[in-house]
Structures are given as C-alpha cells and as structure tokens.
C-alpha cells in the first residue's frame, strides 16, 4: 500500500495537498499562521526584536512548535489532533515539520513510514512553502545527526506534493525598511516618540499591530497611535494622516487616494495636500476640502480630521 517511487508524490499526499487548497484556496490561512508563529518567537512587544537573527538559538528551537500550534488552530476542520503524530487528516496521522532553512527538515526515525506536512518560511525574502510527503527510507539522506535525524535528499524532494511554493509571506515591515530608517525609529528613548517616527518615516507602508507593539514596547501600544494625544495628534500639524483598516470610511479614503488599503488590524500613514481641485485625480473630500497625496514639492499644511466609522 505504501510502496512509493522516491521521485513521485503518492496519491495520499496529492489528495492532502488538493484538500488543503480547497480548505484554504489562496493560502491566506496558512501564511497568516506562519506570520503569527514568527512574531510569537520574536516577542517584539517585550523584546523589540523583529528578525530570527535576533532570537537566541534556544528560543529559535521552539519555532517549529509554534508553527505546529498556529497551523493546528488555523486549519481546525482540515486537521485534528493526531494519535502518534502531530496531526490527523482524513484519519491518517501526519507529522508537522518546519525548517528555518529552505529544505532543512530533520526527520526522526519514528516519522519513517508516516506522512509529513513540510513547511518553511523566509522572513527576509518574504516567501513560504508547504507540502505533504510520505516519508520512506528512499527519500532520506543516508547520514544522520546525533539524534539519528535525517533530511530529505535532493532527489527525495520530488516526492513532495506541494500545496504552495514561493508563496508570499505577509510583510515584516521593520525587516524591509532600510537599516538606517529602523535605527532612526529605535533611537528614540520613549515608545510614543518611536511610534511617531515610525509613521513619519514609513509612509505608505502597511503597519500591523505587531509592528506597533514591537516599536512601542509598551502595554497599551495602540494608545500611542490614537488621535487623543497619540501619533495621529502629533503628526497632524505635519500634514500626515494615519488610516486604519478597522474603519470602513478610512479604508475608502485609502482606496480613493490610490494608496495601499489597510486590512483590519493594519494602518498606513501618508502626507496629504489640499493643493487640488475637482479635476485632480485621486482626491478625497475631508473637512470641507479636497485632499490628495502630497509630493515633496507641496508645502506642509495641517492634516484634516478623519471619520471614525
């Protein structure tokens, strides 16, 4: 039943992959689970960390466990708890394996003769992949480590039934900003100042709650953004508005202005100018005036008040 050619995915793995694509058609659930697992390990609110290189080797070993936990939670209904392995899919035990390196899964002897869900995420290059494989001796390397764990050989990878390869990982904004920009943000002593700088220098970039928590490193980090004394108040005289995805009207404003529309739990800042008229494209009416995205040539003017619905 389990005689599998080492270079060909078996039918069960192919079915797993197809069923998961049916359950999560665009991979949105899986990619969000991987994003949450990475952010959990960074623990930015307490530590200010935002990359795997900043995490100790001991803490990094827990990343695979966090991936398993978040995938189990996110894919409930597609997977359930396994009897001998991490997951059960269609009554079949499946081991969950994550690797920080591209094809670096370490397979223990007890997984041989079982199925595995293999995953990888690269926060720097913003991609992830996930697939299923029936683990046989034929697909594994001959040598093992001290724990007798082996990796999947280059040829053996052809036995993987991929759900997604090179799929885009949700952006880690602090990783993609220039280092000097991040240094400017983190150079401020107080969380409120760091949040102000974040929205000042990272305009037209999606900022998630996790990024805000990492930069603020304070318990009530969202308070540092609000209009009653937070970044919205501080940056308004500089002509900068902060649009939140939690508000339908603010999402519409972003769309009309022609900038990236924030989703729920996301924000985006942009400097605006009232130097426009009804013929100007991408203008929005706020506080009885028309506004558009400002250019470097536009003078600074006080930003309008935003609707909070």
Region annotations inferred by a language model:
Residues 1-85, 89, 98-309:
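Nucleic-acid endonuclease domains
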